[in-house]
Amino acid sequence: MLFPPSLPPTASGRSLGRVETPPGLVRFMVGLAEAPKGGRVLEPACADGPFLRAFREAHGTGYRFVGVEIDPHALDLPPWAEGVVADFLLWEPGEAFDLILGNPPYGIVGEASKYPIHVLREVKGLYKKTLSTWKGKYNLYGAFIEKSVRLLREGGTLVFVVPATWLVLDDFSLLRSFLAREGRTEVYYLGEVFPGRKVSAVVLRFRKGGKGLALWDTRRDGETFTPLLWSEKPEWKGEIIRFETGWTREMEASGPPLGSLFHIRFAARSPEFKKHPAVQKEPEPGLVPVLTGRNLKPGWIDYESNHSGLWMPKERAKELRDFYATPHLVVAHTKGTKVVAAWDEKAYPWREEFHLLPKEGVELDPLFLVEWLNSDKIQEYVKTLYRDFVPHLTLRMLERIPALLPRKGNTERRKHGPYTSPESAGSF
């Protein structure tokens, strides 16, 4: 057994990714949980075992209860449960479980200056070697999901409450495929249920063996959650999970997805700009502001304000990204899931946002498309499908947005003049 790293005396619940679960949510999850009499029931990152206690109260005493906790000071289980001080992600119990339930820690493991879960950064390399779904800036809760699935018996059940980000983010693509291979996945959308936390949550109910996906909405009345089946996908292979409707399917059938028309690029990052010899921190003649998301407005770009604190010669911006030299479509990455688009006629340097370059042979009226992307219809489309799963529009979400093209025979085209104010944008 691998025991946890030596935790600093100042290790806190926050630095370990711990968040208290509201009692009503615990009861809802226990209602989704099941195990055979005499079965083994596990709560990872258990602290005082709220899920074990609630399950025993609801289902009785005929089970073997185990709790694993990395922080010995937080472990406080009742005498009828076995408590284990260990790093759950590296723990090897030698025996499988019939039910695993709880609220795993969430956060990214890394340096204290950037990431909340910094006390585990020394063992991050071991996590990556041990787990097959680790990808990108993997959130710790994804690692807990994979580890738990591996510890289940065939036919065993996992019930976790986790952030909704895994439904759509690329960092969790390996996890979604893993779940699809290993069993049947059910997702219960909750929204923001943790007091004081701007995190949209879902309950994941997974049964090892079987296949397919079921997506549930929930209706909340005080501390009571009522599930409402939204959709089922018997042949789910790990694709992103969305609240599809007949209307969203009609929308997507109405035009080609943006990803089929454009190469979608992301801006150069702040460190790249700061290392570039032509970038200055004070304005000088011949320099232009490096633009950020705050310069991007629906249908127009504020070329005058400087929110980055950086200036550079416009003609040298292409040294950071070649597309900076070409007028192109810019779509917000930093406006929540709201779609905000404008045509960058002046071809300025950007520190943020998505930059869309037409693929070879694609001819478009960019300003017609800008108007469509900023429309109420597109905002409703995105909100319907993705609700508040993630704080920002993602590449995969953007790629799927249908492009409305001008009707054939409509030869009237807008002039491609730069729009630098709300008034000029509204005139096209």
Swiss-Prot record:
<dbReference type="InterPro" id="IPR025931">
    <property type="entry name" value="TaqI_C"/>
</dbReference>
<dbReference type="GO" id="GO:0009007">
    <property type="term" value="F:site-specific DNA-methyltransferase (adenine-specific) activity"/>
</dbReference>
<dbReference type="InterPro" id="IPR050953">
    <property type="entry name" value="N4_N6_ade-DNA_methylase"/>
</dbReference>
<dbReference type="Pfam" id="PF12950">
    <property type="entry name" value="TaqI_C"/>
</dbReference>
<dbReference type="GO" id="GO:0032259">
    <property type="term" value="P:methylation"/>
</dbReference>
<dbReference type="Pfam" id="PF07669">
    <property type="entry name" value="Eco57I"/>
</dbReference>
<dbReference type="InterPro" id="IPR029063">
    <property type="entry name" value="SAM-dependent_MTases_sf"/>
</dbReference>
<dbReference type="InterPro" id="IPR002052">
    <property type="entry name" value="DNA_methylase_N6_adenine_CS"/>
</dbReference>
<comment type="similarity">
    <text>Belongs to the N(4)/N(6)-methyltransferase family.</text>
</comment>
<keyword id="KW-0808">Transferase</keyword>
<keyword id="KW-0489">Methyltransferase</keyword>
<feature type="region of interest" description="Disordered">
    <location>
        <begin position="407"/>
        <end position="428"/>
    </location>
</feature>
<keyword id="KW-0680">Restriction system</keyword>
<keyword id="KW-0949">S-adenosyl-L-methionine</keyword>
<dbReference type="GO" id="GO:0003677">
    <property type="term" value="F:DNA binding"/>
</dbReference>
<protein>
    <recommendedName>
        <fullName>Type II methyltransferase M.TthHB8I</fullName>
        <ecNumber>2.1.1.72</ecNumber>
    </recommendedName>
</protein>
<keyword id="KW-0238">DNA-binding</keyword>
<dbReference type="GO" id="GO:0009307">
    <property type="term" value="P:DNA restriction-modification system"/>
</dbReference>
<dbReference type="InterPro" id="IPR021188">
    <property type="entry name" value="N6_DNA_MeTrfase_TaqI"/>
</dbReference>
<dbReference type="InterPro" id="IPR023135">
    <property type="entry name" value="N6_DNA_MeTrfase_TaqI_C"/>
</dbReference>
<dbReference type="InterPro" id="IPR011639">
    <property type="entry name" value="MethylTrfase_TaqI-like_dom"/>
</dbReference>
